[in-house]
Amino acid sequence: SMGGIRMLPNVTPAAIHNLARGMTLKNAAANLPYGGGKSGIVAEYGLSTQERLQVMKGFAHLLYRYHDVYLPGPDVGTNDADMKTIAVESGLDNAVSKPVDMGGNQIDQLGAAAGGVIIALDELLKEMPRLRSLSQFENLEVPRAEELTVLIQGCGAVGAHAARFLCSWLPGARVTGLSDENGYLYHQDGLPVDTLFNIWQESGPVTRQYFLNSLMEEENTPSGMKFSSEPDDLLRESAFCFIPAAPVANYLDTDSGSDPCMLVDQIGRWHVIIEGANTYSPDPERKVFRSRMERAVYRQMGVMIASDYMVNSGGVIFAAQEQLIKTPGHLRFPDEYKGNARAVEDWLEDHAQEFSELAEQRLAAAESHRDEVIRCNIREMIDLLVSDADMLPNEAAEQISIRRIAARESDKKAVEIMESIPTIPIASTVKLAAAALINSPSPILAVVDDDDQLAGVVTDWDITRATSIGSPDNLPLEQVMTREVISAVPTDSILDVIRKLEHHEISAMPVVSGKSVLGMISSDLLARQSLLRLLQSQI
């Protein structure tokens, strides 16, 4: 699995669970071969440099025991430098989103997620006319790129870069409104994006500073410029596209009880929302709020909604390249360097050119993958929505992700998911087999001969049957075992395995190569991995 480390004073296990579920859908939507993961650190704001270093070192050691199932990256409260600390402690391949000197890419500085949002907008301009087959969109008019107006809520790594990419990639398009924590700016003819981006890079929040600078340089300020100290009032303005890019999941609702940024009946006129911010939650109550909002905004008002993990996966796509394009063996620092920052730095300096070339290779692959998959997501969303007038955008998005998970999992082979199976010598007794089954979570035992080859299997049912007919405890095991074994081979697909289990009405079977026992697959294992319910519909 892959997902970031969130470090906040109030982060909770429940929040981490919800975020991990969201990452599952995001990684699937990004067409990446990883499940969703997340981890959390409870820490106060304002840690000193040394305190932060010690926290990250300690957490790296805690995470290492899970290095074969979880790849950490940055999230709220952590950054690329923290990932470098983890890599120093645990090895280059045990963290993603590392700095360029380790072969990574500066994801926030490159605007990886923001780029995906603007790619989604570009694709929507082409695909949205198909929505006219739905009654709420029958009068939809899609502007040309040079006539496009956009509002952006939030001026962080996503919002600021989205504004810059919009003006660069879609010449003539205008960012007419932009908000941050201090307020919002609006001008119907477009804001000075380059100026605002430079302010953001230099000092962070832009709206108030730009407004105050404008008061002192009135002759250089466009007439009609509006500033409000209430950030949420940006949502009252009208534009073709609204991009939520602030760390607020609940930006709209029909009921003030959920504490949204704005009520639906108070927003301006929009035609599409592209969610740069993370808004998904598996929490049942939050999902009810979300569907309620979409019924009002999408179905009644005719505003298309491009769900967050369909469009903002650029960051995880960029990070994943550090695993998809492996670090060559000769660039991995020796194990004895782990934990020795000075030795690792010397190693990186000695191989700086090769790491730089590796970073460029990964960047090119990431940009290509991001552009292709996000355009595909938009096309698939529109396909689903126009085929079912009752479907909501969040339902379409979830269906796309789950469909990809199912496709990926169905391609897996038995050898990739099997678990160990206990074995017992054929010379054993029924009593010993019964004890072995009681002491093992496995529903079956593999019975092996003197050459350690499969001779049969014993199940709870075999033991129960032997007991019911009064068989003595010392009865040889070979007299009650099942000799005609239903088994899987390593190359069986998951669908093949499920078909065998269901056809023969068994709950488990060994995986064998020739007569050698490799492991076991059971219906319980498939259910634990959430495969069964995803794949049964395809049988």
Task: Indicate residue ranges for each PLM-predicted region.
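Short hydrophobic beta-strand motif reused across regulatory alpha/beta modules
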Residues: 455-461, 507, 518-526
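Bateman (tandem CBS) regulatory domains
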Residues: 412-422, 428, 473-485
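Glycine/serine-rich phosphate-binding loop and adjoining beta1-alpha1 elements at the start
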Residues: 7-8, 24-148
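Rossmann-like adenosine-cofactor binding region
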Residues: 183-186, 191-305
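Glycine-rich phosphate/diphosphate-binding loop of Rossmann-like nucleotide-binding domains
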Residues: 108-237
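A short, polar/charged loop-to-alpha-helix boundary motif
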Residues: 462-478, 525-539
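The conserved cystathionine-beta-synthase
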Residues: 423-442, 448-449, 467, 487-506, ...
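Adenosine-phosphate binding glycine-rich loop
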Residues: 266-409
